[in-house]
Amino acid sequence: MRDLVRRIESATPPGRDRAVDALRALAILGVVLGHWLVTALVTDSGTVHGASPLQHMPRLAPASWLLQTLAVFFLVGGQVGAAGYAAARGRGVTYRQWLGARLVRLSRPVTALLMVWAVAAAVMLVAGVGTATVYTLLKLVLSPLWFLLVFAGLTAATPLVTGVHPLWPIAVVLHVDLIRFGLGGPSWLGWINVAAGWLVPYCLGAAWARGGLRDRRTAWTLLLGGAAATAGLVLWAGYPASMVGVPGSRTSNIDPPTLAAVTFGLAQCGAALLLLGPLRRIPARPAARAAVALVNLSAMTAFLWHQTAMMAVTAVGMLTGRALPGLHTVPDGWGWVLARLAWLPVFAAALLVCWAAFHTYEQGRRGRRGHSTVVRTGVLAPQGETHHDHA
């Protein structure tokens, strides 16, 4: 264990802001736990179909306020992207070279996931698994990939958006919601908010990289102002309280993003900035620093494969021939919640198996003289540029 800590420490560049690494680690843990807690695969109808405890227990909506951490991802992504592009320009790296390297790093682990699931889907269909079941599983696996598409687009636009004030995309989201909700406009307009909505925290991250957002007053303004605006939109404007999608709900705050999701993201960004000070004090011990670094090095693998891990456990559980509580049953009560909490360590163990099989696609190929290239994929990996980790 001590040797692992020393290796991770030696691979960590000096001067790194470990608080940013810790923010990213908290964000990825929130996404993984959030999906595991609000996604159920029910087997009560002869097929496998998705369900959510938020359908049956809407009072659990406040849990989504803690587990939906996408704004933090885009905040950190904007900070890392803007700083990385500025550093690349200082070294004489062209925009095409900088962007190409980042997109290649994003695409490598995604390609592995798509290839595995293309084969798995074909095998299931040949084996006679119903198309509805295969569709449910593929939807769970592929739906998180929208995040990477948006992130790749914002990364490509980094030189253009680094100087954009967040109020501009907020104004776009406001007008889109006003037209589609207030004036009965077409629902497809909401997809404009996919870019505009997540551009808000990305722009905040870019401002952070330029030296802004350093004072606590700004952070408190974002937190309190965003929270107050979100509360007002939920209480008096009819927006859903849940910050994650709920099957069967007429309106989703996240698919596509609404004004409530954007104001909630502002509050999250404010909270994240306020946490920077405490987070810089927490990883004072080498073991704690190594744990944060390890989560960051595995962030992309965890993001891409955590749903697969949950589905693998669900499939193995079906071999018992009965519906296991918290795994195959309808999420309609506190009994299901408690049972699902008990399954989390099993999901984590399955994710470790996925990590062992696929983390090399995230960390890159081994080079000469025993070195391995550790990939930095913007928001889903630690700060800085590619460096080499001595094996």
Language-model regions, residue ranges each:
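Alpha-helical transmembrane segments and their immediate juxtamembrane cytosolic regions
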Residues: R2-A391
